[in-house]
Amino acid sequence: MNAYSFLTRAAELWPSKVAVAARGESVTFGELLKRSEELKHALFETGIRPGMGLGLVAANGPEFLVGLFAGLASGAVVMPISENLRPQEVNRMLELVPLAGVLHEGSFSHDLPRSTETQRGRFSIAMRPREYHLKVAPGVPNAAVIRFTSGTTGSAKGVVLSHQTVFERTEASVEGLQLSQGDAVLWVLPMAYHFVVSILTYVRYGIAVVVPDGDSPEQLISSAQQHSPQMLYGAPAVVQSLINAPSGLSLPRSMRVVSTSSCLYPQHARTFEQRFGTSVEQLYGLFEVGLPLGSGLVSGGDGASVGRALPRYEVAILDPAGQSLPAGHMGSLAVRGPGMFDAYLAPYRPAADALLHGWFLTGDLAVQSYDGSITVKGREKSVINVAGNKVFPEEVEGVINSYPGIQASRVYGLEHTQSGEMVVAEAVPQQGASIDVTALATYLSEKLSRYKLPSALRLVDSIERTDSGKIRRVAQG
């Protein structure tokens, strides 16, 4: 069993159908197979063998798909690496995971001891010395891919999926996404972070990927009008960007707009719907699990509704003892279903040791309503404790972001001698907006309980985020 069969089958069934369109280039499933086959042979010639770790560095577009499928076809365990990671972040990954080589499009200047460097088409294959030519995840039979978690509140962890897991997960995700052969997705996320429930699923089921020429609202809308995709799939920042599109520009009414990767604040969803006449759906995904929740329209309130459990998945809200809580009670969000991850790397930890009676604890605190929908309150590790009261950064950020002229915000806690912790907030003004901090503080005092109010509030030019678009909650050393 190998996920490469997704491509061979797609090329057999739909050889002339477009698989991916990006930067003026459209590549069919047949062409994608041909290029992947050629690169597979090149990988074998340079020494890649089944079970070895293979890094993949490529931009969103055809070459990412070519590199991913060529690596899978060779039997390697593929680990996509974002082009936008800092050198120290990449070097840390290379320390933790003994990759045999890195397949890269363009330059790759990180600390990778090389024994050979081979150029093949648009790719270079940088091979490490022979002591790295070993099975990268020997505890996982038929390992397929590795991806590091985003590390929003701590160190990132390597997550391993087997080919069996990829088969199960893609089968479940296409049902949850409600897409079918011949559909197209306007893709506005980094492929290096989203490639199983999305990219591999799309290829398996004959769904085209459309990569816009850029991330400006004008470019996104132009791509949507040109390709008429059934779905736009992006992060909350994409929704915010489109809200600020010049007047007169519109999105296709038949196109679903899906937000994923982090919380979409309700006020942004409402503004988007007023602007375009289209509701925003949220999908809740985790690399350890897949897409367990979604298809819910973003609702009001102090949190973000991520809908209900998608087909084949179960969800529960657990107390500290691991017991299920009734509707209306806040606890730890737990999910389970097909395609659960196989293991963590560095240190190695099989999934069975990380799960609680088969449940994966997401790290989010949430409430389940009586109709089964889930409202995420915030990350357990991000909760700020102010004199015994719990403050969720996401709630405070939502109120700050509702203030006219605010583009984004970040809220976090700092130690305080009397209250234990205090709330600190940073806010990014929209371009051209003039924000009176005193007026903003007054606005917050009218919307929030006293203990939730920021003790320090300042305007900043930008908010630090992880490469997958999530707010970075911890200072990076």
Question: Predicted segments — roles?
Answer:
Residues 33-38, 159-180, 188, 297, ...:
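Conserved structural elements of the adenylate-forming
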Residues 167-184, 191-231, 245:
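Conserved AMP-binding/adenylation subdomain of ANL enzymes
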Residues 308-312, 323-353, 357, 389-391:
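Conserved ATP/PPi-binding loop(s) of AMP-dependent carboxylate-activating enzymes
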Residues 15-16, 130-148, 155, 178-184:
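Conserved pre-ATP/AMP-binding loop-to-beta segment of ANL
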Residues 28-30, 144-171:
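Conserved AMP-binding A3 loop
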